[in-house]
Curated annotation (Swiss-Prot):
Changing R445W: In DCBXA; reduces L-glutamate and L-cysteine transport activities; reduces cell membrane expression. Glycosylated. This is Excitatory amino acid transporter 3. It catalyses: K(+)(in) + L-glutamate(out) + 3 Na(+)(out) + H(+)(out) = K(+)(out) + L-glutamate(in) + 3 Na(+)(in) + H(+)(in); K(+)(in) + L-aspartate(out) + 3 Na(+)(out) + H(+)(out) = K(+)(out) + L-aspartate(in) + 3 Na(+)(in) + H(+)(in); D-aspartate(out) + K(+)(in) + 3 Na(+)(out) + H(+)(out) = D-aspartate(in) + K(+)(out) + 3 Na(+)(in) + H(+)(in); K(+)(in) + L-cysteine(out) + 3 Na(+)(out) + H(+)(out) = K(+)(out) + L-cysteine(in) + 3 Na(+)(in) + H(+)(in). L-aspartate binds at S331, S333, T370, V411, R447, T448, N451. The gene is SLC1A1. It is found in: Cell membrane; Apical cell membrane; Synapse, Synaptosome; Early endosome membrane. Na(+) 2 binds at T364, S405, I406, A408. The lineage of its organism: Eukaryota, Metazoa, Chordata, Craniata, Vertebrata. GO terms for biological process: adult behavior; behavioral fear response; blood vessel morphogenesis; brain development; cellular response to ammonium ion; cellular response to bisphenol A; cellular response to cocaine; cellular response to mercury ion.
């Protein structure tokens, strides 16, 4: 009787801990089934399709609502909790990891697309174009990226990004003159010369969307400053720490609604698709991208994690399952950030000082899946146009795709803009980006999932590499001096050591019934 009862308790505990994940998986299956059935057996109007997807829209709005307070509070508390030298080392390790994995993803994508050659058997005229090509200048896009790092108005940066647009400067009109043969010739010569040397001016404007890059730069500096202010800055640290905890409580509430929202989100997207024939025409191209994403997420990232951390990477990935599934459904690294935090800290027990610093930066600049996709797409478009790319052009694609994906978050309409930048860098027709837009919505979901997985593995790797610095901070902290159990846990039995341990996962876990070990402190 004891074993069945124990198994029953284990099942109850499993369901209690994973009910959101299980219900989300069920919602995905049910959403796909509902979408296919509604599409086949009912003829919904455009307005009815919009109403049908309304619950999914509410989920997206709730997740986007929580992005801003989450990024601000987590970045400030994460940086303030670290010594400036330690935060510099952690930041450097994170950036090196992001750059290396992104470059590996680009190289993998190029190797696959050159080997499989998905565009050789097709021609440009065989594929229908969708959407329009944005007018992009590589230089202006890079300068806009730097401008957005330093917003002129912090409040405006919460909902708008700065962008520039080129406008042609019209020449002054010539005075009226008699159109003799000589004057006519002079006017035509002047007009031709003016067409050859057009003048442009830069016009600044704002587009809707959170300037995440600018906010991260500000929060990074702000966190460093209040961390150095000592007692004067402690009140601000406590405020943002409380804001971070309150935000995560709201995330838990949103997660309860997530299965219902995802059901209608995925069903509504299936109903919206009008031309499924395009998936057959671009099937080999899609298979190339998905193969690259699968290899990168199942082989390369886990291998890097195992080499550095020496732990089972797939167990770590399973702990991130809810975040990966959310990324797959909503197609946004930033909107998935609340769930990513929760999975990394609660399921995988990653130090909060690492997650609060590394994850917001990773969601902004670590785009492994996007970089791989852009590299494959650029070579695919070259193959469609019967263009043979040389070694120099392939290297250019690698460098441009890596750089463009890192700066994607600071560029308005990032997906199309960065794709056009990569195409323009090697002289490919930018308008051909419209050939692959029709399937981009589906591929975007998978590459977002890879981006989030890369961010998650990054926290585990950076935590391992920063273990010595974090332990030194623990030993030198005031709580460890006040609490003798923190330094003498070896003399306690397992039960007491778990109770008396002073610092666990970036937070202070103490026994409030013990007057010796209990100390009022803020948690980071």
């Amino acid at each position: 009787m004891g074993k069945p009862a124990r198994k029953g308790c284990e099942w109850k505990r499993f369901l209690k801990n994973n009910w959101v994940l299980l219900s989300t998986v069920a919602a995905v299956v049910l959403g796909i089934t509902t979408g296919v059935l509604v599409r086949e057996h009912s003829n919904l109007s455009t307005l009815e399709k919009f109403y049908f997807a309304f619950p999914g829209e509410i989920l997206m709005r709730m997740l986007k609502l929580i992005i801003l307070p989450l990024i601000i509070s987590s970045m400030i508390t994460g940086v303030a909790a670290l010594d400036s030298n330690v935060s510099g080392k952690i930041g450097l390790r994170a950036v090196v990891y992001y750059f290396c994995t992104t470059l590996i993803a680009v190289i993998l994508g190029i190797v696959l697309v050159v080997s499989i050659k998905p565009g050789v058997t097709q021609k440009v005229g065989e594929i229908a174009r969708t959407g329009s090509t944005p007018e992009v200048s590589t230089v202006d896009a890079m300068l806009d990226l730097i401008r957005n790092m330093f917003p002129e108005n912090l409040v405006q940066a919460c909902f708008q990004q700065y962008k520039t647009k080129r406008e042609e400067v019209k020449p002054p009109s010539d005075p009226e003159m008699n159109m003799t043969e000589e004057s006519f010739t002079a006017v035509m010569t002047t007009a031709i010369s003016k067409n050859k040397t057009k003048e442009y001016k830069i016009v600044g404007m704002y587009s809707d969307g959170i300037n995440v890059l600018g906010l991260i730069v500000f929060c990074l500096v702000f966190g460093l400053v209040i961390g150095k202010m000592g007692e004067k800055g402690q009140i601000l640290v406590d405020f943002f720490n409380a804001l971070s905890d309150a935000t995560m409580k709201i995330v838990q509430i949103i997660m309860c609604y997530m299965p219902l929202g995802i059901l209608f989100l995925i069903a509504g997207k299936i109903i919206e698709v009008e031309d499924w024939e395009i998936f057959r025409k671009l099937g080999l191209y899609m298979a190339t991208v998905l193969t690259g994403l699968a290899i990168h997420s199942i082989v390369i990232l886990p291998l890097i994690y195992f080499i550095v951390v020496r732990k089972n990477p797939f167990r770590f990935a399973m702990g991130m399952a809810q975040a990966l599934l959310t990324a797959l459904m909503i197609s946004s690294s930033s909107a998935t950030l609340p769930v990513t935090f929760r999975c990394a800290e609660e399921n995988n027990q990653v130090d909060k000082r690492i997650t609060r610093f590394v994850l917001p930066v990773g969601a902004t600049i670590n785009m492994d899946g996007t970089a791989l996709y852009e590299a494959v797409a650029a070579v695919f478009i070259a193959q469609l146009n019967d263009l043979d790319l040389g070694i120099g052009q392939i290297i250019t694609i690698s460098i441009t795709a890596t750089s463009a994906s890192i700066g994607a978050a600071g560029v308005p309409q990032a997906g199309l803009v960065t794709m056009v930048i990569v195409l323009s860098a090697v002289g490919l027709p930018a308008e051909d980006v419209t050939l692959i837009i029709a399937v981009d919505w589906l591929l975007d979901r998978f590459r977002t999932m890879v981006n989030v997985l890369g961010d998650a593995f990054g926290t585990g790797i950076v935590e391992k590499l920063s273990k010595k610095e974090l332990e030194q901070m623990d030993v030198s902290s005031e709580v460890n001096i006040v609490n003798p159990f923190a330094l003498e846990s070896t003399i306690l039995d397992n039960e007491d050591s778990d109770t008396k341990k002073s610092y666990v996962n970036g937070g202070f876990a103490v026994d409030k019934s013990d007057t010796i070990s209990f100390t009022q402190t803020s948690q980071f």
